Amino acid sequence: KFYKTNICDREAIYKIFEDEKPNIVVNFAAESHVDRSIENPEVFLKTNILGTQVLMDACRKYGIDRYHQVSTDEVYGDLPLERPDLLFTEGTPIHTSSPYSASKASADLLVLAYHRTYGLPVTISRCSNNYGPYHFPEKLIPLMIANALNEKPLPVYGKGENVRDWLYVEDHCKAIDLIIHKGTVGEVYNV
């Protein structure tokens, strides 16, 4: 079933847990557009941090076998362009660069705190940019395609030197499924 509700609506989330009795919870809910987070950080903080807390509290109250937090490589910040040999690892320190990345890093830390404090069985995955069917038109790939088809200018961010990694959405889902079923509780996985 699909429930369209606000992740911050504790009553609605608890009702879903009561009705469905899930044993695995995967938190895909997020505000995720960096530029919008700069214009209006409040909605990012509410959804990404407080919404995560509501889910974690529901998991504690109703009991689950596994909670999985879908995060982002944005929590690591930027790699220097002059060092293409560097990569993010699960041990890379958090170094946020926008309200979006700060909200996701905060949610990750909250999830790990619930694991340590309450013993909640959690895993976290941090991925790069996803692409695939039904991609929001504000995101880079659909925006570039739409602009090219409509003979509009293609946006260039900064000096045009930024590098982005891309992950097909179905590959991301397969990785999440693998982490949920084979991953170690309390660990973070880069995808």
Task: Pin down the residues of each PLM region.
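N-terminal Rossmann-like NAD(P)+-binding domain of SDR-like oxidoreductases, especially those catalyzing
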Residues: 1-130, 170
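Hydrophobic pocket-lining residues that define ligand/cofactor binding sites across diverse proteins
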Residues: 59, 115, 148, 179-180
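Short Asp/Glu-rich motifs
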Residues: 79, 134, 166
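Catalytic Tyr-x(3-8)-Lys segment
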Residues: 92, 161-162
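Glycine/proline-rich active-site loop of Rossmann-fold NAD(P)-dependent oxidoreductases
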Residues: 105, 130-143, 150-152, 157, ...
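A short, basic/aromatic alpha-helical/loop segment that forms part
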Residues: 117, 163-166
